[in-house]
Regions:
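Short glycine-rich, low-complexity segments
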Residues: 1-183
């Protein structure tokens, strides 16, 4: 037995095992890192146009203007849209890079935003699982809002008279737009 060949073979096997162990470690670390990355962080890192698919299948194309842990603000051809992150069921292109979770601000929650819309009497178009409604939010509760129909037909509020109210569950919100297109 040639001891030099024996040692070279042994070192080669150890080196190969180290490479395999390192590859496995890199895979495990990558998986662990990805497990902590939220959709909000990836949306915040998008530089350029993005397409969101909302619950129900509607596509929204535009640029991410702002994003918190609960909502994303997208500017598209039709103006700005405030979308609860829970309503986003698909998005592209997101790329591989994500903003650090520390970059995703806690920001005002959806309830706070809705209360501010109500306080200011902002005319909105509310896209909801129960249909599209044009009007003003007049009350915000723990899990739903009351919307008072405004002027002009939009979606499912077309048959309402001005001033009629509907209560909409927050879990069904898909998108909010200012009725005249300007925030």
């Amino acid at each position: 037995m040639d001891i030099e060949l024996f040692l070279a073979d042994l070192e080669g096997r150890f080196a190969e095992q180290r490479r395999r162990d390192n590859d496995l470690l890199v895979e495990e670390l990558t998986d662990a890192e990805r497990a902590g990355v939220t959709l909000a962080a990836r949306l915040l890192a998008v530089d350029g146009p993005v397409t969101l698919v909302l619950r129900g299948g509607r596509r929204l194309d535009g640029a991410v203007r702002d994003c918190t842990r609960t909502w994303v603000l997208v500017r598209g051809d039709g103006g700005d849209s405030l979308v609860p992150l829970g309503a986003v069921v698909g998005a592209w292109p997101l790329g591989r890079v994500a903003a650090g979770e520390t970059g995703v601000k806690r920001g005002a929650g959806m309830g706070h935003v809705l209360r501010e819309f109500a306080a200011r009497g902002v005319p909105l178009v509310v896209d909801h699982d129960a249909g599209a409604h044009r009007g003003r939010i007049v009350a915000v509760y723990a899990d739903h809002v009351d919307v008072e129909a405004g002027e002009g037909p939009v979606g499912d509020s077309r048959d309402w008279g001005a001033g009629a109210r509907v209560s909409l569950a927050l879990s069904g919100l898909r998108e909010l737009r200012v009725a005249d297109g300007r925030w």
